[in-house]
């Protein structure tokens, strides 16, 4: 296919137009007084959102060159969202400012590579300034403040997320689901839970609720099918002699083995529940290993030369309680060694860092949470489906931002931290075009606060000058329209969000500034229209239908 090739200023100007089209659509959502964006959907009701990344993801431009610029800035918001969960609009505004100011200088004859070096040095100085201002999160109130701000100042969501983190810990799994009612609620499941229920309903201990509850049981973890009774009989006898219940987790329990377990359970000879192992393939092996470490047992695996009939009580796991219903199994207070559990948690965290697959990362995070203790589910309720989707997106954003805050601490919000980072950038000793590159960042750092106040209906430049003159953490709260200490007022951002927004914006900004050539597919003017000849006449033979 033929290509369109554009050079120098022509290429950069087109990219800039695309950048501005996307950024101008995204930046109206910034701040507590940010406006809504309504997005048309092919099917169903339109989406109404104040989430920058949701707006950015919807934008595709007709002109291929402009679209390239827009897609590059879209990368800024999606990358920031992936890393920190919030700050997408801030990142887009920073990128727009860096690109606009930078291209003015490139057009005026500045060397793009020298500008890039200056930008990189200025960003490093600004990031150090952000990290110095960061305050570690100590209490539930701080967590609630961060979550509320990320959820567009919704205190209900903020408090729910703070409660969830309080109950399951900062590494615990918190999932967000749609509720069946209009209430937004929090449910917490303690211990490790996986989505496999009992193999036979005859194993339940409470026929009314159809749940099997076993106190202080032994747990047999086996990675193959159990069908022969002779493999299982001696372990059942040993457990019965010990006077304890037994939980069997294996690929499958069937045939005479299942019949024997059911008969002995009904006769009350032994209390035993069999469940299928969670997951599939290699992931199943890993999850069985997790359960073994959590309960202090071993996976009886024929791959390692172990035989089921040779299993001893010492190889079985233990837990304070196991509850099994039709669909889920929950292991509460497994009796594994804390040191081994922590080692396994560290190993999974390393795998999360190393994996490139989004799906694998999600599954690893689920495993991490199950080991780290507890699963909290936030059920998001709303009156309409449109509101439900918008609210659910805000809860997910707030959750990610809160995790980021716990990780790297919080800084004053409202664009103040970026503005104060100007001091660090201004003190750099640079010459020539490198100094110009640093000035580009210096100017960009005041754009978020300018936009927040502009969206609140005030003159941004006036607020920026006042904010520069203020000391400490005093800034302008656009929600209450007063000057106050931002941290005490609860107007805070996670340091990781602010840092990621600046670094990602500078990265893409530098890429566009150093672009000299663009290559796009030339539109094929002679392409036949697939719908040609189908219009006007209707379908033959259908004339009598009118």
Swiss-Prot record:
Chief place of localization: cytoplasm
Keyword terms of this UniProt record: ATP-binding, Chaperone, Cytoplasm, Isomerase, Nucleotide-binding, Stress response
UniProt cross-references to InterPro entries, sorted A to Z: Chaperonin_Cpn60_CS (IPR018370), Cpn60/GroEL (IPR001844), Cpn60/GroEL/TCP-1 (IPR002423), GroEL-like_apical_dom_sf (IPR027409), GROEL-like_equatorial_sf (IPR027413), TCP-1-like_intermed_sf (IPR027410)
Subcellular location: Cytoplasm
GO molecular function: ATP binding; ATP-dependent protein folding chaperone; isomerase activity; unfolded protein binding
UniProt superkingdom: Bacteria
Keyword ATP-binding attributed: yes
Record bears the keyword rRNA-binding: no
Gene3D superfamilies: GroEL, GroEL-like equatorial domain, TCP-1-like chaperonin intermediate domain
NCBIfam families reported in the protein's UniProt record: GroEL, PRK00013.1, PRK12849.1, PRK12850.1, PRK12851.1
Subunit structure: Forms a cylinder of 14 subunits composed of two heptameric rings stacked back-to-back. Interacts with the co-chaperonin GroES.
Listed name of the protein: Chaperonin GroEL
Organism whose genome encodes this protein: Leptospira interrogans serogroup Icterohaemorrhagiae serovar Lai (strain 56601)
Lineage: Bacteria, Pseudomonadati, Spirochaetota, Spirochaetia, Leptospirales
């Amino acid at each position: 296919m033929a290509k369109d090739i554009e050079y120098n200023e022509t290429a950069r100007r087109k990219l800039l137009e695309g950048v501005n089209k996307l950024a101008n659509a995204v930046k109206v959502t910034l701040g507590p007084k940010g406006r809504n964006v309504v997005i048309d959907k092919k099917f169903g009701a339109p989406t109404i959102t104040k989430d920058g990344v949701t707006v950015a993801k919807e934008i595709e431009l007709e002109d291929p060159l402009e679209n390239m610029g827009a897609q590059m800035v879209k990368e800024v918001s999606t990358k920031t969202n992936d890393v920190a969960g919030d700050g997408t609009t801030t990142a887009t505004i920073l990128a727009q400012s860096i690109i606009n100011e930078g291209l003015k200088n490139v057009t005026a004859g500045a060397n793009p590579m020298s500008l890039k070096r200056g930008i990189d040095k200025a960003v490093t100085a600004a990031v150090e300034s952000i990290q110095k201002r960061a305050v570690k999160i100590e209490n539930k109130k701080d967590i609630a403040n961060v979550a509320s701000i990320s959820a567009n100042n919704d205190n209900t969501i903020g408090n729910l997320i703070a409660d969830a983190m309080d109950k399951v810990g900062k590494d615990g799994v918190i999932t967000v689901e749609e509720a069946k009612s209009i209430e937004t609620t929090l449910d917490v499941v303690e211990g490790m839970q996986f989505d496999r229920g009992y193999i036979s309903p005859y194993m339940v201990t409470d026929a009314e609720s159809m749940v099997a509850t076993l106190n202080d049981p032994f747990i047999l973890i086996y990675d193959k099918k159990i069908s022969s009774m002779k493999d299982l009989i001696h372990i059942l006898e040993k457990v019965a002699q010990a006077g304890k219940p037994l939980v069997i987790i294996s690929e499958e329990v069937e045939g005479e083995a299942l019949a024997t377990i059911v008969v002995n359970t009904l006769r009350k000879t032994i209390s035993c529940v069999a469940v299928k192992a969670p997951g599939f393939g290699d992931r199943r092996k890993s999850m069985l290993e997790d359960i073994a470490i959590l309960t202090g047992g071993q996976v009886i695996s024929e791959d390692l030369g172990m035989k089921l009939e040779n299993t001893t009580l010492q190889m079985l796991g233990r837990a304070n309680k196991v509850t099994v219903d039709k669909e889920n199994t929950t292991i509460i207070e497994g009796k594994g060694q804390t040191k081994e559990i922590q080692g396994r948690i560290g190993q999974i965290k390393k795998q999360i860092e190393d994996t490139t697959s989004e799906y694998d990362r999600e599954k690893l995070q689920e495993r991490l949470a199950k080991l780290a203790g507890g699963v909290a589910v936030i059920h998001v309720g709303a009156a309409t489906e449109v509101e439900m989707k918008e609210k659910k997106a805000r809860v997910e954003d707030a959750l990610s931002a809160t995790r980021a805050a716990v990780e790297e601490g919080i800084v004053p919000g409202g664009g103040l931290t970026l503005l104060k980072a100007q001091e660090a950038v201004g003190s750099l000793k640079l010459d020539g075009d490198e100094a110009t590159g640093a000035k580009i960042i210096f100017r960009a750092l005041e754009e978020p606060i300018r936009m927040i106040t502009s969206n609140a209906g005030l003159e941004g430049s006036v607020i920026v000058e006042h904010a520069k003159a203020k000391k400490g953490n005093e800034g302008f709260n656009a929600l209450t329209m007063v000057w106050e200490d931002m941290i005490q007022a609860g107007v805070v951002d996670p340091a990781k969000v602010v840092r990621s927004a600046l670094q990602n914006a500078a990265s893409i900004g530098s890429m566009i500034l150093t672009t000299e050539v663009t290559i796009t597919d030339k539109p094929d003017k002679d392409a036949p229209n697939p719908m040609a000849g189908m219009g006007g006449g209707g379908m033959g033979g259908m004339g009598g239908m009118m």
